[in-house]
Amino acid sequence: MVEIRRDSWGVPHVFADTLRGVYRGYGFAVAEDRLFQMDMSRRSFTGRVADVLGADYLAFDRMVRSNYTPASIAAQIVALGQEDRDIFEGYAEGYNQRLAQVLANPAELMPREYLDFGFQPTVITPEDVAMVWVGSLANRFSDTASEITNLMLLGECIEAHGAEKGRAVFDALRWRNDPATPTTVPREDHDGPSPQHWPRTNPVPLSKAAAKEWMELERLRLGAFAADLEPRASNIWLVRPERVAEGKTVLVNGPQFGWFNPSYCYGIGLHGPGFNIVGNTPFAYPIILFASNGHIAWGSTAGAGKCVDIFQEHLNPQNHRQYRHNGAWHEMQSRRETIEVRGQAPVEIEVLSTHHGLVALTDHEHHTAYAKQRSWHGKEIESLLGWIGSMFAQDHASFPAQIARKASMVNTYFADRQGNIAYALAGQYPDRAPGHDPRLPADGRGEMEWRGTKPFATNPQVVNPAQGHIANWNNKPAVDHDNTCTFVWSAADRLSEIELCLPATATVEQLWGLIEQTSSST
């Protein structure tokens, strides 16, 4: 038995006596409210947009298909136990149930967008349900790697100023660690070292043609050139009861994704055996990112770790399908993808990879290729399930164990009724070889191989800091956390705005009102 009740705001609340039933109702409600949005989301995250919108989206689909391995995601889904499969299968069943109603009565139920663009919605699979999360949170937001862009910058600095001065200018623009930078983990709670300089490496420069190709790939990935994007991210503050007039624990989370219609997020209540979860989440994910279950509350902001490294592969000048590793030539792996294109014949593409990972760019002029090694590759579904598992935690003791399962990067926050607050930078991060400068592509010939991943205990994190609050605006996590591909932090940081606004003691209403003072135009 599945029942959907809507509150006074129209937000659906799903009631069922099984987990599968809850997710079946969730999928049905999403298809009822956001059919076109969800259809285009899963097409965008799986590279199937040109199939319905035509050749203008072929380059986008090519970029998406080349940036993940569908067989890996499918294998992870197949390997799940039935309880975990119930989440994805139930969601797809409910979505497809509503879709069948729409297709049976299109005159009254078909969303207008399908009529405008001239195509029909199709059924989704459990894999599609997972890919909406994987394609955005993993393949996009956890896939930041600026080494190629930095290599371009280094080349321009050297070209303009000569080798030594050019390197000095580059180091000044891409510094390692400013110890004066505001942090989310208070200094008294995390007294780590703050090294100032990276080791020097000398990767092969990037050719002009390869640089131009990379800039276009980045434009496709981001939707615009990076310099043209408005700043977006998220902020949050958590305050312990001793600093709240009403004696309550407060968590205020301000996601700053930008303005969209329909909204980037979807509000939902999930009520099943032993749980009552209410909140909202981007793209109607299976995980409710910003929510409470009556015992605990949790939230997120964009994390800034470094879980993806770019390796510079040295190619055989006579055969660019071969790369050098440990003194021998190795054949790249190859797979072919067929992209359906509305109004024309299908297009076949080739996707190459080395033992490091997918090849993101090939510089034929300089006989190099650039492969992505991701700490979270093959762990996407486990990461999602860890996040889902955290929704059912009822105390601080059980929450971190679920967060530790997440290999993809994100800032995660926790608060409970007992007055506990906590923060952790989730994700699994590489244990790099000595001499590795993560600002630039690592030498792929064997000297710079990862030694594994670091344990979760080494991630920046804090529980109940002495100051009585936790705040973040996508700032530096801890004093010994180096600058990353996403952010280059300094003493001037917008976190200071939150810290200045937080009074020594405040009412719940005052803490909620701070959102008006710290919201961006997006």
Where in this protein do the model-derived segments appear?
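Substrate-recognition/specificity elements adjacent to catalytic centers across diverse enzyme folds
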Residues: V2-V250, P255-N261, G274, T281, ...
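Hydrophobic alpha-helical segments
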Residues: T368, S408-A504
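Short secondary-structure boundary/capping segments
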Residues: V123-V134, A138, C265-L270, A304-C307, ...
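Compact, glycine/acidic-enriched structural inserts
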Residues: N276-A345, I388-F392, E499-L502
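Second-shell loop/turn segments in exported
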Residues: V22-G25, A71-F88, Q373, L384-S390, ...
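Short helix/loop capping segments that flank catalytic or ligand/cofactor-binding pockets
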Residues: F15, Y23-R24, W133, G247-K248, ...
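Structured, non-membrane catalytic/scaffold regions adjacent to prosthetic-group chemistry
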Residues: A79-Q101, I236-E242, G247, Q256-G258, ...
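Ordered core of a single globular domain
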Residues: N139-A145, L151-A168, A209, E380, ...
